Amino acid sequence: MNLVITLPQIKHLAQTGSSSEYFFFFMERKPNIIMDGFFTKISVSTSYFTMNGLFLTFGIREKHTDDVYINDAVSSVQNGYDNKYYIYFDPYTIENRYTTECVIQLEEIILKMYGNTIPSKTPVYSLKTQLQGGTFKIHRERSNEMQGKYILKISGVWESAHSYGVTYKCTVYS
């Protein structure tokens, strides 16, 4: 079972600085074999249970046309391998602006919390950079799976000698 957090809940968390429903905490730092650094899992807890990772749902309406999916705000193109697709969108439309602001605020909250433990390192806002640029990568099984709804999983924080940032993956919500 996974607990999914909605955009309004993220907005509330960003505005108040706290949540009566969710508590975030970081697990033990472990060496990262992919990069020279460390990985720390993020856990989310409620009064009922605790789980690894943070799951956020968000939606973007899409229109399908051949191999490229286009509407006024969104288009996606398959990269041709590993079931990875790039979603291109206008981050400044009303619908998309709300989504990007919420996700950016969530990333900022997590990195601020983590940064309190390592003040000498610089945060890297990779989600913010991608979303403000109007793109993100998703994982899906079939090209006809585009439904305009996605799940962002933030599994933890990576840390190198000088910087740190969130580790995340986007998938199609089914």
Which residue stretches match the model-derived regions?
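OB-fold ssDNA-binding interfaces and closely related basic DNA-contact patches used
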Residues: M1-T117, Y173
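Broad gene-expression machinery/nucleic-acid interaction feature
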Residues: F55, Q147-K149, G165-T167
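Fold-level signal for large, globular catalytic cores of enzyme and receptor domains
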Residues: Y81-R142, Q147-I154, H162
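OB-fold single-stranded nucleic acid-binding module
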Residues: S155-S174
